Regions:
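Flexible inter-repeat linkers and adjacent short helices
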Residues: 1-104
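Alpha-solenoid helical repeat architecture
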Residues: 3-5, 44-49, 92-99, 132-139, ...
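Amphipathic alpha-helical segments of tetratricopeptide repeats
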Residues: 33-40, 76-90, 118, 122-133, ...
């Protein structure tokens, strides 16, 4: 049987992430399953396997965000996956290092560990220049604004939310995120 090109799987992971960013659960689930089936037949590529693990982690964060479990419980394997990825962190470079720190910051934020979250976000910020996607940069700024808001650092929050909303306004498909940015601004100014 012929091996699946890792570049093909990488493109599929990018498409999966596109749907994760838009909170499009049905399509994200479909891509995840398709990619899992391709991984078994893929040529060996450790970086791509790490990328898959990071996106799987982000996928689970999305699901927890959309459907939080009661009393602070989390999905059984999200913590295990987080620990597995954290163990492999020293292998991450460049954009993968950005994603690790950004996603782990989200994870810590969702667990109300704000100081840990800001530490991971700051590490991600050092790699932000490697991110070419405007929406990804906007999402980073939105998350920074969100955490600074929770830490009562309104000037920093306003700085980041202004950058995020500017990008979201330019994209027709991000109206919901633009509205969420407006909520943050409204919360800061009242």
């Amino acid at each position: 049987m012929e091996k699946v090109l890792s570049s093909h799987v990488g493109m599929k992971i990018n498409e999966w992430y596109y749907h994760i960013q838009r909170f499009n659960v049905p399509d994200a689930e479909a891509y995840k399953e398709e990619i899992k089936s391709l991984l078994d037949d893929m040529e060996e590529n450790q970086d791509l396997l790490l990328y898959f693990s990071l996106m799987e982690f982000r996928h689970k964060i999305m699901l927890d965000y959309l459907n939080p479990l009661e009393n602070g419980k989390e999905r059984a394997n999200i913590r295990e996956l987080a620990m597995k990825i954290k163990k492999d962190q020293e292998k991450l470079t460049g954009l993968l290092d950005f994603y690790f720190n950004f996603f782990y910051g989200m994870y810590e934020f969702e667990n109300y560990e704000y100081l840990n979250a800001i530490t991971f976000y700051k590490r991600a910020e050092k790699k932000l220049s490697l991110v070419s996607d405007d929406i990804e940069r906007a999402e980073f700024n939105y998350k920074m604004a969100e955490i600074y808001y929770h830490m009562k650092q309104n000037h920093m929050s306003m700085h980041h939310i202004a950058q995020a909303i500017e990008c979201y306004r330019e994209k027709e498909t991000y109206t919901v995120r633009e509205i969420q940015c407006s909520f943050v601004i409204g919360s800061i100014t009242t």
